[in-house]
């Protein structure tokens, strides 16, 4: 799925910064989540995309970082809501559970949606 996402981003003209992994070997996803989170925190990357099997471990690790608001999205409706209501600055895809076509629809919606503010801003601010 990662290669598909990279090609999707390039096709759409989005800048790409690849934090790994670079092989099919088993890896520890927190290493890559921390690298992505640091990119978000220091302004090198916005927004970010994380991919792992279920997406949960990546999202949990990313959300341990101040200023990172990672949301797990398995369909385009969730992708829209994590932007509109939660101001997600990272989307996490569950690579084992979605196909490339679904990933493309999810990313299209994530990039199209914008934060609505209002009551959602108050909620966002209360969860640092």
Label every model-predicted segment.
Residues 1-15:
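Glycine-rich phosphate/diphosphate-binding loop of Rossmann-like nucleotide-binding domains
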Residues 3, 59-61, 102-103:
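Short glycine-/acidic-enriched loop or helix-start segments at secondary-structure transitions
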Residues 7, 34, 38, 60, ...:
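Alpha-helical segments flanking ligand/cofactor-binding loops in enzyme cores
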Residues 15-26:
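A short beta-strand-loop structural module common to alpha/beta enzyme folds
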Residues 30-34, 74-75:
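Charged helix-capping and loop-helix junction motifs
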Residues 32-50, 54:
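Short, structured active-site "lid" loops
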Residues 50-96:
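Mid-chain, well-packed structural core segment of small domains
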Residues 76-128:
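C-terminal binding/interaction regions
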